[in-house]
Amino acid sequence: MKASAPTSQPDAIVVGSGATGGVAAMVLAEAGLQVLVLEAGPDLSSRQAFGSEPLNTARRVAQIASGKKRLQRHHPGFWKHNPSLFVDEQRNPYSTPDDAPFLWSRGRQVGGKSLTWGGITLRLSDYEFQAAERDGQGPGWPIGSADLAPYYTRLEQLLEVHGACDGLPQLPDGHFLPPLPLTPGEQHLQECIGRDLGLPLISSRGFNLHRGPGWPRSSSQGCTLARARATGRTQVRSNAVVSHLLLDGDQAKGVVLVDSRTGSQERIDAPLVVLCASTIETLRILLHSSETH
C-alpha cells in the first residue's frame, strides 16, 4: 500500500509518548521546535486509564482467563493498575527460544509504561557502567555516572523526586526533596534490621503517593508531556504504529506509520526523528528500516 503524504511537516518526530518520549518532546518543544509525537495506542483520559476497584479486579480475572494477559500478569504493576494498560497478547504476540524465555511487558497508550511503573528513580552507578569489563564479558560503557549526573539532577528536580543522600558508591546520591515518611511496617523493619544486622534502612527514592483525580507527576501526561503540550508546539497523534524510518543514506528523514484503526499508511517527513518506543520496539523499527539492517 502506498503511503499518503501529510499536510504539514514538523521539525521533529518523537516515536513513543512514555517516560523518554515525554522528556524528548518537552525539550524539543521548549527549544522552539514544532514536535509531532506518535503513539501506537489510544489517548485515554485519566479516568479511563486508571479505572477503579472492584472493576479492575474483574478485568484482571477476565483478561487472564481469556489468555489475553497470561504473560503480562507477571509484571508487578499488573496487580496495582488497570490491567487494560498492558497489551493484549493475542493481538500483540511474540515468541522466544525455548531455552531463553523473556517476559516482555508492554503498554500501548499515550503515556506508555509511565502509567504503570513503580516510580523508583535510582541513578545508575559506575558498577553498572563497568560491569561487563569487571566480569570479563567485554568493554564497559564509554560513559560513566559523572557524565550523566547533570541530566539526572535536572530530571530529579523536574519530577520532584523524594529521597535521602546515603553516600553509597553503588547508589549515587542525587538532588532530592526530603524523604517520604516510613509506614509503620517500614519503621518496624528499620528497627529489626538495625538491631539484628547493624545495617541502616535506606529510604525509597521516588514519588509521593498520588491521590485524587488527574495525572500523577510520575506519568508523562502529568509532567513532561503536559509541558510539551503547553508550548502549543506539540501535537500528539495516537493509534499511529510506526512501521519504519525513511532514510537518506545513513540519516533518517521521516517515518512511515500505519493507522491502527483504518490500516492506512502515511508518510511523514521531518529533519529529526527521535525513537522512544521502548528498547525492543525501537530495535524493531531500526531493523525494519533497512534491507541491510
PLM ranges: what are they?
Residues 42-67, 107-118:
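Conserved N-terminal glycine-rich FAD pyrophosphate-binding loop of Rossmann-like flavoproteins
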Residues 18-19, 184, 280:
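Residue-level detector of alpha-helix initiation sites
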Residues 92-94, 98, 257-262:
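Short acidic, glycine-rich loop/turn motifs
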Residues 11, 33-34, 198-200:
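Residues that mark the start of a beta-strand
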Residues 5-20, 36:
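Beta1/beta-strand and adjacent pyrophosphate-binding region of the FAD-binding site
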Residues 61-65, 71-87, 93-103, 108-109, ...:
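Conserved redox-cofactor binding core of oxidoreductases
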Residues 27-30, 34-59, 240, 245-246, ...:
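Glycine-rich loop(s) and the adjacent beta-strand/alpha-helix scaffold that form part
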